[in-house]
Amino acid sequence: MADRLRRTGRAVSSGDVALAKAPPLVFAGEVDQLRERLAAVARGEALLLQAGDRPGARAALSAAAVRDTLRTLLQMSAVLTYAASVPVVKVGRIAGHYPAPRTGDPGLPTRTYRAAASTLNLVRAFTTGGEADLSQVHAWNREFVTASPAGQRYEAVARGIDKALAFMKACGTDPAGLRSVEFYAAHDVARLDYASALTRTDSRTGAPYATSGHLVRIGDGDRPPDEAHVGFAARIANPVTVRLGPATTVDEVLGYVDRLDPDREPGRLTFALRLGAERVRDLLPELVEKVTASGARPVWVTDPETSSGAPGFDDVLDEVRGFFDVHRSLGTHPGGIHTELTGDDVARDRERPLDLAFRVAEFARSPEPGA
C-alpha cells in the first residue's frame, strides 16, 4: 500500500496510512453495475445525468443541502426519462470534489473521507427511504411548473407524466423501482494521494478499484490531465470521465481512448464536453467521427454550464441544442448532460437546472436538428 501511495510523488503521511486502512466508500460490485449502466448509455439505450457541487465547494454539506441536491437531480431525471423513453443513469458529484492538497494540513484527507462517508450515508438513506418515490418527485415537478414563469411551456410534459402515472395506477402496477433509485457518486481526482489511499483490490477479480467514488473524473477542460492522473485512471477498473475543452485536440482525445479504453469497452470512458455555444457545432463533429472510427464507444456528455465565462442560460441552451444537433446529424447518441448545482443554495436556485431539464426534454423529443 505504501508503494502505491508513493507513486503520487508525495511522502506518505499518517493520514494516507489511516485512509489505506479505512473502509471503502463504495464497493466494487456497485462500480461494476455502473459500468453496465454506462455501457447501455454508450449503446444508445439510456441517458446519463451528472450533477453536483460547483468546483470549489466545501467538503461538508448539510443534510438539507444533500436532500435538495438529490431532489433536484431526481426531478430532472423524471423529466428526461419521460421525454426520451429510456432509463436515466444518475451520477452525483456530491461526495468527493475537494480542494487540492495544502502544505501543512496533513489532516485534510481524513476530514475529506469523513465528510464523504457522511454524505454518501445520507444519499443512500434518501434514495431508499421514500424521498425517491416517483409520485413524490412528480409532485415536486408539478409545483415547479405551476410556479415557473415558463410553466405553460412545460405543461405538456407535466400532463404526459400525469397520464403515464395514472395509467400505471389503473393497471395496478406499483413496482419497487418507482419508490427507490440507483444513485452513483462521481469523484474528481484532483488529489491522487486521497484516491490512491482509497484504492482497493477486489477479492473476486484481483482488479484495483478506486473506492472513493463509483466514477472518477480527470481534467478540467481548460488543461489536459497530467500523466499521473491519466496513469492512475488507466490502472483502476472504475469508469472514467475526461473533461474536454475547446483547446483539446483530436490527437489528445484519441490518446485518451488508447490509454484509458484499450479494449474498446462501451461505457468505460465518458467525454464531458465544455466547448462553448459558439464552437460546439464546429468542434464536435470531428471529435465524434474520429473517436467512432477508432472503434471506441464512449459516452458523450455536454457540460455547458462550466464553459468559460459563466455562460448565461441562453448560451447554455444553445450549446445543448448544438450538442444534440451534431449527434443527430452524425447518427450517434447524445449520451447525456452534466449540470452544476449550488451546494447549500440548491433549494433556492433549483429553477435553472429544472428549466434546463424541461428544455432538454424538448430537444430529446424533437425529431429534427435545430428544432
Question: Language-model segments: what does each one mean?
Answer:
Residues 1, 13, 169, 290, ...:
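Intrinsically disordered, low-complexity proline-rich regions
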Residues 55-56, 61-276, 320, 326, ...:
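Active-site-facing alpha/beta catalytic cores
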Residues 1-50, 54:
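N-terminal basic/disordered segments at the start of proteins
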Residues 7-9, 13, 27-29, 52, ...:
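Alpha-helix initiation/capping motif
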Residues 256, 268-273, 277-299, 306-346:
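Non-transmembrane, aqueous-exposed alpha-helical and coiled segments at domain scale
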Residues 43-46, 83-86, 266-267, 295-297, ...:
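Short coil/turn connectors at secondary-structure junctions
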Residues 30-39, 70-83, 284-295, 321-329:
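Short amphipathic alpha-helices and their capping/turn segments at secondary-structure boundaries
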